[in-house]
Amino acid sequence: MPEASSPFPDGIVLGFDVGTRRIGVAVGSALGAGARAVAVIDVHGVAVDWNALDRVKRNWLPVGLVVGDPLTLEGHDQPIRKQAHAFACQLRERYRLPVVLVDERSSSVEAASRFAGARAAGYKRRRDADTLDAIAAAVILERWLADPMQATSLP
């Protein structure tokens, strides 16, 4: 749960998992510990579908934004990291909300495990696999909710 020194006031927070073709979006409350997948936004080349993202923002009215910081498992830089940081800066400029970066190592593995569990229980089908990006965003957001002080602020 966010502490007094968190960059966000209490309220709704959106989390993002940035990929080369899609951006997963999740929602959570700064007062709680859970998050849920809500959307997958298409990326065309390097252009984000901002109209779709604007609708998500209008629907949820977040007080802050959490973007996954895609380091390698060893903690090194990788090409997608530059895109994720650029997206985080674009979010801050466009929405004038606080944005933080959260280490997303292994979030895709955890998301795949959650999806497999939901599929085995009959809640998801193979065609729902594109929701994996949104599930990964929920994992990232839950990490921030559990420990907001581990986040990195944008420069």
Swiss-Prot record:
Subcellular location, principal: cytoplasm
Hydrolase recorded as keyword: yes
Subcellular location: Cytoplasm
Hydrolase is among the record's keywords: yes
Record-listed E.C. numbers: 3.1.-.-
Signal peptide segment: none
GO CC, alphabetical: cytosol
Pfam families, per the entry: RuvX
A biological-process GO annotation: rRNA 5'-end processing
Record keywords, A-Z: Cytoplasm, Hydrolase, Nuclease, Ribosome biogenesis
Family, similarity comment: Belongs to the YqgF nuclease family.
PANTHER family: POLYNUCLEOTIDYL TRANSFERASE, RIBONUCLEASE H-LIKE SUPERFAMILY PROTEIN
Protein's name according to its UniProt entry: Putative pre-16S rRNA nuclease
Species this chain originates from: Xylella fastidiosa (strain Temecula1 / ATCC 700964)
Organism taxonomic ancestry: Bacteria, Pseudomonadati, Pseudomonadota, Gammaproteobacteria, Lysobacterales
